[in-house]
Each structure stands twice: as C-alpha cells, then as structure tokens.
Amino acid sequence: MGKAVKMGIVASLKALKNAEISIPEAIIVGTGLGCLQDTEKFLTGILDNQEQHLTPTAFIQSTHNTVAGQIALNLCCKGLNFTFVNGATSFESAILEAKMQIQQQFLQNILVGGIDEKSDYTYNLYKLEKIIKSENQAPFSIFDATTQGTIFSEGATFFVLSDSLTTDTYAELVDVFFVNKTQNLNDFINHFLSKNGLSTDDIDLLISGRNANLDDVNGFDEVEKIFSASKIYYKHLSGD
C-alpha cells in the first residue's frame, strides 16, 4: 500500500469519526499528481525489465483514483466514487462537485478530500525546473521571496459535507468559485463577494495561500491589498 493510500485512509477515517458517519453516500477526491511513488515504481520496472515480465500491481496502484477506490473498499462504500485531477485546483474541483451534489439534493452527505505525495524522481525533476526550491536555498520565507519555486510538501485532508446542521458541524460552506484566467483580480473578488451579498469590508479574516515563490508575489500582493481585514498565513508551516 502506497503512502498516498495510507494517508488517505487515515485522514478519511478521522473525518468520518468526527462527523459520526460510518459510511458516506459518496467519496470525492482531488489529486494533482496521484500516486507518484507507485507510478515511478512501475515505470522503473518497465525500463529495468525491458518491457517484459511485468506484474500489474504497481500499475493498478499508480492510477489517480487509487486512493478513492481504496477508501471505498475499506469502508465497503458502494456509492458514487469520483476523482478529480485538475492540477492546482483538483481539491477545489472536488469540493465544488460535492457542493453541487448536495445543493441539487442528490445526496445528503459526502466524504471529500485532497491528497498528494512526494517521490524522489519527480522531486529532483521539479528542482531542476525550479518548480520547487532546493534544500540549499533554506531557510524559506513566504514574506520575502527571492527565488523561484515553492516549498514542496505532501499530505491528505478530508471533510464530510452534509445538507444539515448538527452538533458536529464545524462550519458552513457558502460558495466555491474559480476560473482558469482572470485579467483583473479586484473585479474577480468583488464579483464573487457581491453574488453572495458581501463586500470586502464585510470580511473579518483573510486566509492567504501566499507561498515562497518569487513569481507569485505580485499576485498575492494585489489580492491582500484589496482587504483591510486581518490576514493569516500557513504555507510556511505546511508547504505547497
């Protein structure tokens, strides 16, 4: 069992336990890269064995929907089982799908999560392409970024979305909205808030995804200037 599967099963079980739900009606997962370690293991096997005498195990466990499938097998859940692979917005896509399923009254509760793992070969390639930072560039600061690349990390997070308020409810998910490209961040944010009957002055706290990538500094600066509310940051602790 790969690391991504292990993380996914543990995180999903904890989420279900907190929600006091044994079997969800659906499982929706978002992943940007899938089970990288098993993917590399399978591809390495192809090269080492000259494309002969390969066992299918590593290939089966390398597919992007492996985590959602293994969670369903572990729970004996026969409901809807979706996996979204949409780059940096994979988790957001999963959340949006779950929200629409509940809003349209198709389902009453859904286990939804996001997961990604690190692997040695991909990690080294990303460093060469300056997508992530090298260890010799440490310490990394998200407030004073001077180099390209983000802080690479891995992990799993799961939530249970429900159509009703209970004593175990943490918060209400009001809206999810994202686009592929926007010419004006200010207009995009104000449109999102206005369609929910809000303005920037109504926001008490902004949770910023500011990272340590020099290429992203201007974008985060522009967004944070729009809000006068307090701001908190987390990627210096969790990575990207």
Regions found by a protein language model. Name each.
Residues 1-70, 74-81, 116-118, 195-227:
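Conserved beta-ketoacyl condensing-enzyme motif
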Residues 3-10, 22, 62, 66, ...:
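Conserved active-site and cofactor/substrate-binding residues in soluble primary-metabolism enzymes
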Residues 9-18, 72-74, 82-113, 154-166:
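Active-site-proximal alpha-helical scaffold in enzymes
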Residues 20-21, 52, 75-77, 102-104, ...:
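Solvent-exposed alpha-helices and their adjacent loops that cap or buttress functional pockets
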Residues 35-38, 90-94, 118-123, 182-183:
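Short, well-ordered, mixed-charge alpha-helical segments that flank or form enzyme active sites
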Residues 54-59, 81-89, 144-148, 179:
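Flexible, glycine/proline-enriched loop segments at strand-loop-helix junctions
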Residues 106-128, 147, 175-185, 208-217, ...:
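Acyl-CoA/ACP chain-elongation machinery
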Residues 126-205, 229-233:
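Condensing-enzyme catalytic core mediating Claisen C-C bond formation in acyl metabolism
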